[in-house]
Amino acid sequence: MDLSVVVVTYQSRDHILACLRSLDAGIHAHDPAGAPLAWECVVMDNDSRDGTTEVVEREAPWARVIRTGGNLGYAKAVNRGIAATRGVLVLVLNPDCVWHPGAIHALAAWMRSHERCGIAAPRILNPDGSVEYSARAYPDSFTFLFNRYSLLSRLWPGNPWSRRYLLLDWDHASPRSVDWVSGAAMLARRGAIDAVGPMDEAFFMFNEDVDWCRRMNEAGWSVDYVPEAAVVHHIGASKGVVSNRVILERHRGMIHYFRKHHRRSAPLDRLAAFLIMARARMLVLLNRTGR
């Protein structure tokens, strides 16, 4: 088996079919390299209640639906999907991604020609065609203050921390190795997964991709951005309205990441955790007030 696709769904009925149809069309399209892919697809459903699984089973019967029995989080669902498949390459995918023609074959060709590439990722576009800055530098202590969505980044868009983190001094139009890429769409080599281990299930959602890519890089596998392959990401469509749990889990993931990769003195760890969760509580409060 050349390729296994693992799609994790949660309340994804409105977008999953566009994702799967673009996937199916892209894989069955003619590959200029003349190398057809033997492939399989599993949809790991995290207890959707909106008819996601029924739509997939009716409209895309070639995809195997696995019901996880609860909302396990992204990392745990991905790991179960990887364990249930056998492809040499594993495409981890959000259900709100729609592939451009030729993109999947371009990623597979990159992996064939770069034997030490552990993860290859496409250029991810927003629905309006602009680039989603999905290839980034490792986060540091200032990242949670100056990340893509923070108020400080909006007030000071050209700040040096955002430029470093989002790699804004690079045009994102040429291939290169990077620190990490978004888990919304990433093609991983099973041999690399076997070497470094699966995603860390201590991350419920968010930051598991940063950690996985970091472990790949540290083990000598490259993480490569391949802009020839492109996908449109209808970001947030698989999450629905942002819940307080999503906000809290994102910030808990930040704390786990920093404790795992940036351990300092206990007082500094506690201070960093306090500041991160204070930000989370502020966002929860704003979420409740509808702001």
Region annotations inferred by a language model:
Residues 171-230:
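A short, conserved alpha-helix in the catalytic core of glycosyltransferases
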Residues 211-291:
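Active-site-adjacent helix/loop segment of glycosyltransferases
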Residues 68-85:
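Glycine-rich, basic loop-to-helix element that forms the pyrophosphate-binding segment
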Residues 90:
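Short aromatic/hydrophobic "clamp" motif used to bind/position activated sugar donors
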Residues 22, 45-54, 70, 100:
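A conserved acidic beta->alpha catalytic loop
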Residues 98-134:
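Conserved donor NDP-sugar-binding/catalytic core segment of glycosyltransferases
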Residues 12-31:
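Short, well-formed alpha-helical segments that are part of the catalytic scaffolds
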Residues 139-178:
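Short, flexible, basic/aromatic active-site loop/helix in glycosyltransferases
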